[in-house]
């Protein structure tokens, strides 16, 4: 038969310690009179001495004053946790149920919050928040090789400054009961979206319009390298003439090799898994407005990017300007 372990209230522990501290009992005498193990009594005596000196213990307090402090601290902890829960829920909702614990942690740290991924994960679990997981991604494959346009970039995705290398690609979006086509231009330096266009036709006009937007918004840079897959739109005379007019060089991925344009694939993966409704959009105008909000707002300015050590692309560029004095 196992011996049942004795439990003691804080009041009993305090009175036992007072026998030693206030009434002159030795540790051995007090322990013997109360039927205690002397080592336990010594712990209580030490704790009571510390509490009388103003130290709040990690274990349950013995004095009424320190018990009150512990109650207040527990209340503050509860209020703080409720505040953090509320912020986690706000960020999760704003991200359309897509952000995971790492992304939310980065967002909160950027706001000045001292919080780790374990706590964020715990708060998400309490709130029953489950990040949407992206499904499989189907890559387009070119059917015609373009030996006249080499893969100059050759997966050198790390560049030293903005407006040195841009990437482009096209994806499809369901809106108004039919497919629409989205062309995006990405600056590789901080993975910032610098231009985009949406159309009902995946033609040369679409990619030219996205390039025109990027060219104007970025101050008409020249001499940069534009990289894309081997889609016919990017190999069209219309697009290549526009590159020539803007004094841009052209690079193309190898046929059927999606990894040669991996940064663009990631943008589209994030857009579709995090933002676009699974049923698509009711109208083309709604798609235009919502996709623009994601690319130029949420993706560029809010969403943390691992490539930028948790900074959103636009903020990573701003940081470069601050450090280097660029205008």
PLM region spans:
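Residue-centric detector for conserved, function-critical "anchor" positions
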Residues: 1-83, 251, 324-327
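Charged DNA-binding/catalytic regions of mobile-element recombinases
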Residues: 2, 27, 65-327
């Amino acid at each position: 038969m196992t011996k049942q372990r004795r439990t003691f209230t804080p009041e009993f522990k305090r009175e036992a310690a007072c026998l030693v501290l206030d009434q002159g009992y030795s540790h051995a005498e007090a322990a013997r009179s109360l039927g205690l193990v002397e080592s336990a009594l010594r712990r209580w005596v030490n704790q009571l001495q510390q509490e009388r000196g103003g130290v709040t213990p990690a274990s349950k307090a013995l004095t009424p004053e320190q018990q009150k402090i512990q109650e207040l601290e527990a209340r503050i902890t509860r209020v703080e946790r409720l505040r953090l829960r509320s912020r986690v829920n706000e960020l999760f909702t704003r991200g359309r149920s897509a952000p995971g614990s790492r992304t939310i942690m980065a967002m909160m740290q950027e706001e000045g919050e001292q919080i780790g991924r374990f706590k964020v994960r715990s708060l998400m679990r309490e709130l029953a928040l489950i990040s949407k997981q992206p499904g499989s991604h189907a890559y387009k494959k070119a059917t015609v090789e373009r030996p006249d346009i080499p893969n100059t970039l050759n997966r050198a995705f790390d560049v030293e400054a903005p407006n040195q290398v841009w990437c482009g690609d096209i994806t499809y979006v369901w809106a108004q009961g039919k497919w629409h086509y989205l062309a995006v231009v990405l600056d590789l330096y901080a993975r910032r979206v610098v231009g985009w266009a949406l159309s009902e036709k995946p033609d040369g006009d679409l990619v030219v319009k996205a390039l025109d937007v990027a060219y104007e918004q970025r101050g008409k840079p020249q001499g940069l390298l534009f990289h894309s897959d081997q889609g016919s739109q990017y190999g069209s005379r219309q697009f290549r003439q526009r590159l020539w007019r803007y004094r841009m060089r052209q690079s193309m991925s190898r046929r059927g090799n999606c990894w040669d344009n991996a940064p663009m694939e990631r943008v589209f993966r994030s857009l579709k898994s995090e933002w676009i409704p699974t049923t698509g959009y009711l109208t083309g105008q709604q798609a235009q407005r919502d996709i623009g909000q994601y690319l130029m707002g949420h993706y560029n300015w809010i969403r943390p990017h691992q490539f930028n050590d948790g900074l959103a692309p636009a903020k990573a560029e701003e940081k470069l300007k601050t450090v280097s004095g660029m205008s």
